[in-house]
Amino acid sequence: MPELPEVETIARGLNRRVAGDVIESVWLGSKPEPLKSPATKIVNALESRRIAGVRRVGKHIVFDLENGGRPALTARKGQAGKSARPTRSGAQWIVHLGMTGRMLVCPPDAEIERHTHAVAKLASGRELRFVDPRRFGRLSVSSGFEAAGSEPLEVDLASFVVLFRGRKTPIKSALLNQKLLSGVGNIYADESLFRASVRPRRRVASLTRDELGRLYQAIREVLKEAIALGGSSISDYVDSDGEEGSFQLQHRVYGREGQPCLVCKTPVKRVVIAGRSAHYCPKCQK
């Protein structure tokens, strides 16, 4: 599943390419799974809207929309709803990529891939296409979408300590709790815990303030490095231009079960914590 760095990379690419463009028409596929909001509501909220900007909120891509677009084009065959000009402002198109979702900017003559669930035709002639083979991704509209938890790159150390201090769950599980930190997943939790020298099974309450401080810094460092390298391309992840990231080449423990630790040469271990895999070095992490 794309995590914070991958979603940030995609959102930045989309903002660079489509901010200021106008959504003229929207086509939605027949599969109901990707639609978290009713199809007609999505179409009516998007058509004739100008894309004010694209940003990341947690693991979601948020298209901020505003009025003032040109009249919508005639609906395509299969379109789920009629063209309409929304009267309210501040609408948002929310995209969660799920496990295999991709949000691509394509020329209109590009072949439409199998598993394409949404196409937004833009005034510039290009198309925004949502492709998701496994259909765990979600499309919705909102007017005030916010992340459930704190943003890892925005929260300060004192607030971070307050969020985690005293919890009885394993630290790996706490890092994956989107109501605490929004956007961190398996990859970056494992990599951050390694850099902080903390084992994933440790109960949060057992961590000292110094250890929480190291973890806070490690999370920020790992996420910033991953964003700079375009994220980790594992399985299907590509950015909005169809390009892969390269942070997977920098992974120190994630996905390296049985391989020697890059620091001490001890074989990396994999354990399951609350149904989720965790990778760690039994010597470097305490």
Q: Could you describe each region identified by the protein language model?
A:
Residues I23-A45, R55, H60, N67-G68, ...:
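Basic, nucleic-acid-binding surfaces and adjacent catalytic neighborhoods in DNA/RNA-processing proteins
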Residues P2-P5, G149, P200:
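Proline-rich low-complexity regions
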Residues M1-K77, G81-R135, E154, R209, ...:
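Gly/Gly-Pro- and Ser/Thr-rich, intrinsically disordered tail segments characteristic of DNA damage-repair
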Residues S89-R195, R203:
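Phosphate/anion-contacting hairpin/loop surfaces
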